[in-house]
C-alpha cells in the first residue's frame, strides 16, 4: 500500500508582475473577470471592463504600485513567499508547502501541479483570508476545483474555510496592537478596517460581515477595550453599487472632525501588506485624517512573515477536520 504524502497549498490574492501599466492591466483583467469578484453578466461587464475601466485605471493604479514597490518587488508576494518558506521550515521537507495566487503568478495551476509532481495524496488548502468571503475564499475553492476537475487522480482535500476567531490569529493581532501602542502611545480610537464587499453579496448569504465582527469582538475582548475605544469600517470599494458601511475613508474624516486626535488603524483581513494597506490606508487615509484635524495617525502593519503568523498557519495545517 502506498504511503500517504501530505502537502500544503497557501493561497493569496495575487499581484501584478511589475509596477507598470501593462502588467497592472493584465493583472486587473484577470482579477476583475472572475465572476466571484464581479458577478455582472459577461456580455455587459467585459466591454465595459476592457473598453473603459482598464485603459483608464491601469496607468493610475500602476503609479500607486510604484509607490510601494520595493527592491524585492511586490510586498504582498514577498511576504507571502516568506510565510510559505517559514511554514516549510517548521513542517520539514517531508511535507511540501507551495504558494499559489488566485490571479497572476505563481498561479494556482502551477502550484497545484508542483504539489502533484511531489506525489502529494493528502492536500490542505489554506487561503490567506482570515474572514471568509465568496469573493476571496470561495474563489480559491473554485480555482482548486477547476484544476482538480482536469486530473485523473485527485488527492484527498482539506479546505480551511477561514480562521476569523482562531486563538493564534487573535493573539497575533493583539501583539501587533500592543507593539503599536508601545511605540505610538494610546490612541483615542483603534480603527479596524476590513476590505469591503458589495452589500448585495451579504444580502444574498455571504457571511463575511459576521466573520469580521467575530474577529473584532475577539480582539477587543482580549484587549479589554470599551466600545468608545474602537470603531469598525470597510475600505476599497469599487464601482457604483453600495458596499458594506461605514466606509473607511469617510470614517477617518468623521473621527477627526468629531475630535479624535490620535488614530491607529489595523487591517485584520490582510495577511500580508499590499497596495490596500501600504498606500490606501497608510498614505491616503492618513492624509485625509490629518487634513480633517487629526494630529497623529499610525497604521499597524499586517502580520506579514511574523513568527506568530507562521505558528498560526502551522496550527491550521495540523488541526484535524471538524
From Swiss-Prot:
Cellular compartment(s): Cytoplasm
Spell out the Gene3D superfamilies in the cross-references. 3.40.50.1400
| The keyword Glycoprotein belongs to this UniProt entry's keyword annotation | no
Catalyses which reaction? Answer: heme b + 2 H(+) = protoporphyrin IX + Fe(2+)
SUPFAM superfamilies listed in its UniProt record:
Chelatase
Q: Which one GO biological process term can you cite for this protein?
A: heme biosynthetic process
Recorded GO molecular functions are:
ferrochelatase activity; metal ion binding
Q: Which Pfam families match?
A: Ferrochelatase (PF00762)
Q: Which GO terms describe its cellular component?
A: cytoplasm
List the pathway annotation.
Answer: Porphyrin-containing compound metabolism; protoheme biosynthesis; protoheme from protoporphyrin-IX: step 1/1
Q: Which InterPro entries match?
A: Ferrochelatase, Ferrochelatase_AS, Ferrochelatase_C, Ferrochelatase_N
What superkingdom does the record give?
Answer: Bacteria
Which UniProt keyword terms apply here?
A: Cytoplasm, Heme biosynthesis, Iron, Lyase, Metal-binding, Porphyrin biosynthesis
Residues that bind Fe cation, according to the entry? Answer: 195, 276
Q: What is its EC number?
A: 4.98.1.1
Q: Establish whether keyword Cell division is in the entry.
A: no
Tell me the protein family, please.
Belongs to the ferrochelatase family.
Q: What does this protein do?
A: Catalyzes the ferrous insertion into protoporphyrin IX.
- Give the protein name, as stated in the record: Ferrochelatase
Query: Whose protein is this, by species?
Result: Edwardsiella ictaluri (strain 93-146)
Amino acid at each position: 500500500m502506498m504511503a500517504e504524502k501530505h502537502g500544503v497549498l497557501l493561497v493569496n490574492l495575487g499581484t501584478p508582475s511589475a509596477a507598470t501599466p501593462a502588467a497592472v492591466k493584465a493583472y486587473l483583467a484577470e482579477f476583475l473577470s472572475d465572476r466571484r469578484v464581479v458577478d455582472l453578466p459577461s456580455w455587459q461587464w467585459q466591454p465595459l471592463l476592457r473598453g473603459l475601466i482598464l485603459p483608464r485605471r491601469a496607468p493610475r493604479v500602476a503609479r500607486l504600485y510604484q509607490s510601494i514597490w520595493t527592491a524585492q518587488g511586490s510586498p504582498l508576494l514577498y511576504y507571502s513567499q516568506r510565510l510559505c518558506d517559514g511554514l516549510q521550515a517548521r513542517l520539514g521537507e517531508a511535507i511540501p508547502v507551495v504558494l499559489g495566487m488566485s490571479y497572476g503568478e505563481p498561479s494556482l495551476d502551477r502550484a497545484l501541479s508542483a504539489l502533484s509532481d511531489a506525489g502529494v495524496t493528502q492536500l490542505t488548502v489554506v487561503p490567506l483570508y482570515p474572514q471568509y468571503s465568496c469573493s476571496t475564499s470561495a474563489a480559491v475553492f473554485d480555482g482548486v476545483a477547476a484544476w482538480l476537475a482536469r486530473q485523473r487522480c485527485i488527492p484527498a482535500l482539506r479546505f480551511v474555510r477561514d480562521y476569523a476567531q482562531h486563538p493564534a490569529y487573535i493573539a497575533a493581532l493583539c501583539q501587533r496592537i500592543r507593539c503599536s501602542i508601545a511605540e505610538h502611545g494610546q490612541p483615542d480610537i483603534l480603527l479596524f478596517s476590513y476590505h469591503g464587499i458589495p452589500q448585495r453579496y451579504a444580502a444574498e448569504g455571504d457571511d463575511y460581515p459576521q466573520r469580521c465582527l467575530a474577529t473584532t469582538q475577539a480582539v477587543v475582548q482580549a484587549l479589554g477595550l470599551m466600545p468608545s475605544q474602537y470603531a469598525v469600517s470597510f475600505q476599497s470599494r469599487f464601482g457604483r453599487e453600495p458596499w458594506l458601511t461605514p466606509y473607511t475613508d469617510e470614517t477617518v474624516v468623521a473621527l477627526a472632525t468629531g475630535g479624535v486626535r490620535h488614530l491607529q488603524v489595523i487591517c485584520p483581513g490582510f495577511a500580508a501588506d499590499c497596495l490596500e494597506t501600504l498606500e490606501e490606508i497608510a498614505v491616503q487615509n492618513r492624509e485625509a485624517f490629518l487634513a480633517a484635524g487629526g494630529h497623529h495617525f499610525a497604521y499597524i502593519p499586517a502580520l506579514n512573515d511574523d513568527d506568530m503568523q507562521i505558528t498560526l498557519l502551522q496550527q491550521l495545517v495540523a488541526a484535524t477536520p471538524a
